[in-house]
Amino acid sequence: MSETTSSSVFSDNERINVKEYFFKVVRYVGLFAALTIITGVFFYLLKPYYEFWNRKGAVAQCLCVVGFIVLIFVGVYCKKTKEMTPDLLLKLILIAGYLIRLTYMLCTPVSVRQYDTYNRASTGHETYAWIIYSTGKLPATNDYQFYHPPLNAFVQAMFMHVTNGLTEILQKVFGLGDVIPSKYIAAMPKVTDRYYVGLTEYRYYLYSTTQILSVMWSVITMVALVKTLKLFCLKGYTLAAVSAFVVFFPRHIEFAGQVNNDALTYMFQMLSVYYCLRWWKRGRRLYDLLICALCIGLGMMAKISAAVICIPIGCVFAYEFFREIGKAVSAKKNGESGAWKKVGYMAACYVLFLCICAPIGLWFQVYAYKTFGQKLGFVFSNLNGALGTTHHNWFERLFITFDPNEYFGTLYCQTFCTIKDGVTTHYNNYNLPLFQLRSSLFGEFNTYKGGECFSATAFACGLLSLILVFIMLVYCIVLFFKNGKKMLADEPERKNIAFIAIMTASFLISEFMFYIKMPYACTMDFRYVMPVILGFAMIFYYARRRILAANTEFGNALVFVSTFCVAATISLTTLFYLVCSV
């Protein structure tokens, strides 16, 4: 049997070495399997010491600091011995990225800084997974979080079966019955006759093991983002610098400890972007297209809003399709035969794409509609009135506010209004851009202790970064009109910029409309627009490059200050997550 397969339709495709590709897949599977085991080992070794030294999470944080010191020592040593290369630096960054994610998971109980995981009525994400684990069936209602597609809950349920078997071995063979689960129930909600009914210590422990999966989702996303940056033709130390931004972006760290469906959804969104760009830039190979379809379908099976990523991907498909039609028309005029076969082949590939993506991504929507009458795109909206933000006008909520309290009144997100005897005594945060900034750094939580010197400075640098990036974009427009064609990018770069712009705009507009439809503080959370992290990184990279190419005194100063502020924001938030507690 031949070791290569190819398409006879596209001449610029294609030949893939099946053997080489197979071993590459095996290497990645082996790597992530090994990291899962390592993460599990640290989970079982260090979670019992969560409150050691009378400070929550200190042991895990010390471990991470030691790891960072070792990585810095290795980097300095390699630099002095002239063995440092961009590839080695990138590997050190990725290792550090794994370490900070592992540490955050070890420092954060499964009930802390989560989204809709535990609730008093037992209709959150934890109960969703537990129902599948204990019954093998979907919930009988679509209450609260049960309206979501089941992929995240299903994977967690399967993983709990694995950890349940492992626990039985640890208890019976190694005599750890006194340790498990009693040492793994930090921050467990208090069970009463009315609240958290059915929650036991063992159930709480078992679900907490799914944080191991969250670390892996975040790590896989991290790798996918770095590989995507390579597809944008970033190389050398530039690639390492931009990779450091996406690796250490604070919400990526938080996702490593959060067990709702956001991390899994985001992972599949970034994988779909990666395989779409591979298809686009590396010969339009069919298997890249099919993997992209699978990732989109699985993302929608975790959370239907994953479909937003279809907008930039669909634009790529449409662009290539119409470009192929244009080629076929030109070839027909020149008397060439068979030109339309390529168009037909591409159309067939797109149909195959839909045949994979649509059933996987939409079957639950059909099931929920037939079972519960749940409409497509349904979002649970029976929210706590204290989350409402209609106490301020639409302009202040959506664009700019001149209320100093919204800027400086709170460091972290204030999600709920304070209401006493039916009277609001303190309003929550309501401005969308500011809430997005705060939640991009710290989530929508204010349950942090310690590290305020880092978090406060990070917020200030982050706010300044946004202002400076906006000025950079305006300055790029000025340079374009001033220098004309000298500022034009080449065709591949224009395609990259167009894709990034469409992707970023798709999510920001989606979030904008979401907040208009549901004016609550929780709908402003940055977790709904996570793919814009890649967009921001690339927009900053391109703007910085264009301004430096112009070589003006103002532009160079602007680039220096903005780069410093962005680097400071990422560095300070990383330090913050190394020292903060619950």
PLM ranges: what are they?
Residues K230-C233, S272-D288, G299, F321-E324:
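Membrane-interface transmembrane helices that cradle and orient dolichyl/undecaprenyl
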Residues D288-I304, I309-C310:
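Membrane-interface alpha helices of multi-pass inner-membrane proteins
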Residues M1-C107, T210, F321-F322, G335-I356, ...:
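Start-transfer (signal-anchor) and selected internal transmembrane alpha helices
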Residues W53-V65, E201-S218, T418-A505, I533:
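Membrane-interface anchor segments at the N-terminal boundary of transmembrane helices
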Residues G97-Y98, V242-V247, I296, M300:
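Short helix- or helix-capping micro-motifs
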Residues S111-I212, A386-C453:
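Interfacial juxtamembrane loops and adjacent helix segments
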Residues I169, S182-Y204, I220, L225-F248:
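Transmembrane-helix signature of polytopic, membrane-embedded enzymes
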